[in-house]
Amino acid sequence: MQAILNTLRIAESNHGISTGLATWAGQGDEIASYSPVDGKLIGKVHAASRQDYDTVVGQAQEAFKTWRLIPAPKRGDIVRQMGEQFRKYKTELGTLVSYEMGKSLQEGLGEVQEIIDICDFAVGLSRQLYGLTMHSERPSHRMYEQWHPLGIVGIISAFNFPVAVWSWNTMLAWVCGDVCVWKPSEKTPLTAIACQNIIQDVLKSNDVPEGVSGLVVGGREVGEWLSHDERVPLVSATGSTRMGKAVGQAVGARLGRSLLELGGNNAIIVSQHADLPLAIPAIVFGAVGTAGQRCTSTRRLIIHESIYDDVKNRLVKAYGQLRIGNPLDATNHVGPLIDEAAVQSYQAAVAQVGALGGTFAVEPHVLTGDGFSSGCYVKPCIAEVENQWPIVQHETFAPILYLIKYKTLDEAIALQNGVPQGLSSAIFTLHLREAEQFLSHAGSDCGIANVNIGTSGAEIGGAFGGEKETGGGRESGSDAWKAYMRRQTNTLNYGTTLPLAQGIKFEI
């Protein structure tokens, strides 16, 4: 691991403040990053003071004046070069993601691949950023719309995808002509510093204005500074619903924009017409992948009563084959939770299930002993519950899968939608009418609705986000880029008269 840290220029003590070209040690508290894999100290980071933050934002303001004037395809070419850098460091960065966050090495590498993919997407986007033309009711007039850069984009990212979500926002914002200030999770600061180190050579070689890529490591207060800062027209925040409400209220109070990607309480409906050999692996990966710490993790399984016992038995067998341990070992399926607080949340949730009368098809357990020295490893469990129970309505970031029976598809969809969150959903069925009903206006109310695949593992080509307490924001693909720009409608008169719209007469 030390060789990887050296390659990524991660030291025992690290500078947590950067304007892209310059870096320095913040005047705030020192943050220590411990690996949930083995409990060992990876490194420390000097976090930001308010003065450090203001310096980064001030530099970003100056950089925007120049960056917005660079042609979008040129900005896209710079992003292309960044994608090449991430290809070069994919193994090292993916390994650090796995070690600092705790997800499997395959998932860590996959997260870096997401950065590469969004870079590729953004390069093509840089030659589009299209507006529309409209026909004017007035003779010798032309109407169209165009999109302009917005300014500083504040990015608040979460620990579970410590680098991918940053890239979804940043690469699109950059080709749109914006500049970025990134507040990474204080639980995974070293991966953020590694990303800044990786792109620094590209910034320098292209004479990119200092301040285009800002990094401010710190705690909750940094997020509060971003949210209240009128110099930051857009704040994109990923995290809990509680955090998102605070950000949304603060940004909304100053009439700024917020892009919120918050909690999920995702369900899969398993129809009596499902292909179970196809469904079971998707359910298991959705429930235990990243130790249940994805926004799109499968939390609830809504099973037709006629196949309930069969599905439960298949899942119990599959869970019995799961290998839990060091995520850097490719033979293991499940790594640790992020920290001891997450373990306590897991324990509290399973205790509530028991208190409400729930039963466990696969028993919960906190793992100790050889290989589990960090205290962050838990056994994925399966509980039989009722959908209306408060603990089932709540998102617990842990590998707990709730089983729920249904009789009719209408009932299943009502159960699926019957939670405060609305991120991801899925149905397994070979019945065309069931699939189409699930995808219809009367079907899933989530931002993501899948058929015959699970709730997690979204590609970057589609817009990512959800409804209700998930926040309503959209990141990544499709036309999510529009959130990072300001729309302008233009009317051009190339005639010699001045007719007014709606036939209004005004003569002087």
Each model region followed by its residue ranges:
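Residues at or immediately preceding the N-termini of alpha-helices
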Residues: 36, 50-53, 72, 90, ...
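Conserved C-terminal structural/oligomerization subdomain of aldehyde/semialdehyde dehydrogenase
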Residues: 38-43, 207-208, 269, 323, ...
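Residue-level signal for inorganic ion chemistry
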Residues: 39, 75, 97, 119, ...
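Short, well-ordered beta-strand elements within core beta-sheets of diverse protein domains
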Residues: 41-48, 63-69, 155, 268-271, ...
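Glycine-rich loop-to-alpha-helix module at the N-terminal edge of alpha/beta enzyme cores
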Residues: 42-130, 140
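Rossmann-like NAD(P) dinucleotide-binding subdomain of oxidoreductase/dehydrogenase enzymes
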Residues: 131-278, 406
